[in-house]
Every structure is written in C-alpha cells, then in structure tokens.
C-alpha cells in the first residue's frame, strides 16, 4: 500500500493516462471502484444492510454509486438509488450504469424522504471535482444525510469537501467512512476534511497508474 497523497489535478492526470494512454476503459475503473466500496460495506457494516440508500449525483461519482447499488443488490442487499441533480447532465458512464441498474429493476427515487428509512447511506454525489459552493438539491441532500444517525460511506470524497484544501464548500457530508480510490487525497488529511472523512480506506488496487 502506498502512502502517496495526491491533489485533484494529479488524480485526473493519472486517470487520464490510464484511460487514454494505457487504454483501460473508464467503465473498468468504475467497476473496480464500485467493487472496492461494496467490499468495504459488506465487510465493515454487515449489521447495517437492511435498507441501503445510494445517493447518486449525475457525474461519474454518481455512476460509481449506481454500480455500487447494483453490486449490493446482487449480493442480496435491499438497496434504493436516490437520484440528485439533472439526468440530462449525466456523464456517458453514468448513463451506462443507469441502463444496467434498470435491467436489474433496482428501485430509484428523487424523494429525500427515502433517507428516513435508511440503515446505511452511500454518498456518491461529488468526487474530486468540486470547486464551488454546493447549492440547491445537492445542498438539500447533504443536509438531509447529515440529519440522519446512520452509517454514511462516502465514495472517493465526502460530497462538499474540497479535494485540495479540505475546506467545506458551503455544506458537506459527514461520513463514517470514506473509501478513496488509488491514492489518499490531500483534502482528506487537512482542515475540515480530516473530520468529515471519518475512517479513510484507500482502495489502492484500482488499476490506475501514476506517471508524473
């Protein structure tokens, strides 16, 4: 396991090199990310799996979340996808994951009330890309998550935490555990990010290659 800690720019560079130069498709990386989060949830929180809610944004972090929901569903977990944001803005990878989830008839909703019955929440709204204050439906979702008292597993970064500074961008998810991909992130080690991340699990077997 590496102790390397990276910025958002470095992580984007590594992802881009892996996808565009080496040729590993982004969907492969997304599946590996989802497997890592699924494994952490199943192994670390087996008593919290009665009603899992995956809160998915419209970008690739949300695509990770939808893949996580599918993998939990296939493991026999009752899971609901809570969609946040505009589906018209969904990334291509997100759209692919959504199509697969529909095949498996995984329940989906946009009603925040579903969080009231959750026994575990997966935060998959924002990954490493946030650079402005969280507002609107995303802020409402974050505040609703924080008003629960259940286990929260953040995907890559707690939504609302700046990847480079660890600062809260208006509002941010308070996670029980953050599963971050390939390398630890600077924002998880400083300022509010240290507290909001909870326990940090670095999923370093991602197939992402660092070339500086």
Swiss-Prot record:
Cofactor: K(+)
Leading EC class: isomerase
Record carries keyword Isomerase: yes
Positions bound to K(+): 61, 123, 159
Entry coiled-coil feature ranges: none
InterPro entries: YjeF_N_dom, YjeF_N_dom_sf, YJEFN_prot_NAXE-like
SUPFAM superfamilies according to UniProt: YjeF N-terminal domain-like
Family that this chain belongs to: Belongs to the NnrE/AIBP family.
Highest taxon above the source species: Bacteria
Protein name: NAD(P)H-hydrate epimerase
Ranges of residues in domain YjeF N-terminal: 11-212
Organism for this UniProt entry: Limosilactobacillus reuteri (strain ATCC 55730 / SD2112) (Lactobacillus reuteri)
């Amino acid at each position: 396991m590496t102790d390397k800690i990276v910025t958002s720019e470095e992580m984007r560079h590594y992802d881009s090199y892996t996808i565009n130069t080496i040729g590993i498709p982004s969907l492969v990386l997304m599946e590996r990310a989802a497997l890592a989060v699924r494994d952490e949830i199943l192994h670390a929180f087996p008593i919290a799996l009665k009603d899992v809610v995956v809160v998915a944004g419209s970008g690739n972090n949300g695509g990770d979340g939808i893949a996580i929901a599918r993998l939990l569903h296939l493991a026999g977990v009752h899971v609901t996808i809570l969609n946040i944001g505009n589906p018209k803005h969904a990334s291509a990878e997100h759209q692919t994951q959504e199509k697969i989830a529909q095949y498996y008839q995984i329940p989906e909703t946009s009603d925040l009330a579903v969080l009231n019955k959750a026994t575990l929440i997966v935060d998959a709204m924002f990954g490493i890309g946030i650079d402005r204050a969280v507002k609107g439906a995303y802020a409402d979702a974050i505040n609703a998550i924080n008003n629960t008292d259940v286990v929260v597993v953040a995907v890559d970064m707690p939504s609302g935490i700046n990847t480079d500074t660890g600062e809260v961008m208006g509002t941010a998810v308070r996670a029980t555990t953050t599963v971050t991909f390939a390398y630890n992130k600077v924002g998880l080690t400083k300022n509010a990010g240290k507290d909001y991340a909870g326990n940090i699990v670095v999923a370093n077997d991602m197939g992402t290659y660092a070339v500086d």
